[in-house]
Amino acid sequence: MPTIQQLIRNARQPIENRKKSPALRGCPQRRGVCARVY
């Protein structure tokens, strides 16, 4: 358990859940999810 002074110096950041494919965020057509067929 951290001391009060440590908590004041750097407050705890909430752990953010990681996205499964961060590299494909800008390119949805490479993700393998097909929303529409042309």
UniProtKB/Swiss-Prot annotation:
GO molecular function: rRNA binding
Disordered, as annotated region: 1-26
This protein's UniProt keywords: Chloroplast, Plastid, Ribonucleoprotein, Ribosomal protein, RNA-binding, rRNA-binding
GO cellular component, one term: chloroplast
Leader sequence residues: none
Subcellular location: Plastid, Chloroplast
InterPro entries: NA-bd_OB-fold
Main location: plastid
Role, per record: With S4 and S5 plays an important role in translational accuracy. Located at the interface of the 30S and 50S subunits.
Similarity section: Belongs to the universal ribosomal protein uS12 family.
Quaternary structure and partners: Part of the 30S ribosomal subunit.
Protein name, per record: Small ribosomal subunit protein uS12c
Naturally occurring in which organism (per UniProt): Pinus contorta
